[in-house]
């Protein structure tokens, strides 16, 4: 009897296994490859830059000297005196209206000895061995004869590079010198030593690596720009973000003060300087505007992205002062928008087109999009937006205007904004979502039922905010990236409504951050892509030209069995690209049938991004904990059999005829 029962149990177990695997084998997906639903905008996946987390000065901008023109609130911040064997002193002089954008300079007095200033850089200076570095200084000779010695030293004070300057003029003159380093330093310092007897006036003390992006003198940090270029973004939104608004209107971002000669750009305090308490406060966080609107346009052109500038609409940050410009005093703000279009697109014979040409770019930048306000809300915003719209539509109807739906993805402010914008000329409405990973999974169908005839959506700032630990990069977990991937299948599936999308924020220095998670982390010498970065890259590098449907049992797959799907046809490359997210903790198998097309090869490729640990993350020391792996797959007829690993993003590419 026991043997019989045992055989029955064994048979039932085997039958269950057969039924289980048969059920797995019966999971089928159909991709309607010959029935494009909607075009995918070339701007679909882009990047959003804001000068937060030392993303510009100390980051993307390759300048190594902090407070190079003595314009911080404390003019000697970042500098310390070096006294050797004698007397010397530094006097900060403010020349006021003589040079209002850069009024301060330092008068260095030396008394028969060596006296100097040492600059600490941005959490130190990252120096690479055997590389050329370019030093420059604006100087005017006073009494006596002064020579200048320039030294780079490492954290222990050892000299790793040096040069010198002499024969200064009695007029303000830029002097330059270059040298090659003998060692690497993560936290180097620059020493500027003055020798002789007398005094000399100095300003704009600067040090750049020779190797910048495209080797432009005094340009951008090459490795950080390369991370952006590798994303192949369709657009770049700049310069923010909350710095567009400022804590008060006086501190707002004004693009006209960021163009022209570097020494004539007016530095201001970065609003993230005072936004958070210790340890995230940053009293040394200012904006030199070495990256200004010209450099942003140039960067967009370099990486093949549409420029999307955002302008202040006469409102300061509503989370801070919330002050607004009176409606009868809004004209200067509107004029800034009109002048920006002229700067970007105008002929060289126009006032602002000539400024662009004089900076080295006579050809227009072909600006097509313009954002009015960053993250504003309520009646005061809509009233001001409409004033911009009236003027811009009349004079530049070719420009697509971007309005704000406020800081939240739902609620009374959000609903009010959308109600008002549906009767406007806004081409895109900027929606922001900083939410939990669970929210992103739940909202993968958010745009399935949006109005197809209303303004289009710009998913301008989003990031899943989940678990973290004490490690700086730990907020960027695989679970948060996986949630974003699931949500992005919904954005792609609704590409007729969603025309732009960008993760935020973009950059963060590991020792100088105010906000996390962030897409790309860096220190003075290294950079690392987060799991979220590789999700963005897999979508942006596989954008396609037209949306096609992925169906299971005739229905869209958006959360059933924790699977999320979208697909595109790329008419340019002749490929079908299928994106599948398995958010479950177990593997899942599918048979995928491509309907209406013939496959060009008997193999497909699949890129898989996954981790067995939902809360794993990449760090500067372990950069590929979560990293895409590419493999080939077999094809049988028009079918592909695929096994999706647990907690994975899978991108399948098939060549078609």
Residue ranges and their predicted role:
Residues 1-28:
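Bacterial Sec-dependent N-terminal signal peptides
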Residues 195, 209, 239-242, 313-314, ...:
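Active-site groove signature of glycoside hydrolases
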Residues 138-143, 180-182, 541, 581-583, ...:
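Solvent-exposed strand-to-loop "edge" motifs in beta-rich extracellular domains
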Residues 26-288, 306, 321-331, 338, ...:
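Extracellular and organelle-lumenal recognition/adhesion modules and their flexible linkers in secreted
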Residues 47, 137, 232, 300, ...:
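Conserved, mostly hydrophobic/aromatic
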Residues 595-621:
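Solvent-exposed beta-hairpin/edge-strand motifs
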Residues 164, 561-600, 606, 650-653:
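Carbohydrate-binding surface patches
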Residues 390-393, 397-400, 418-421, 427-542, ...:
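Catalytic-core region of carbohydrate-active enzymes that cleave or remodel glycosidic bonds
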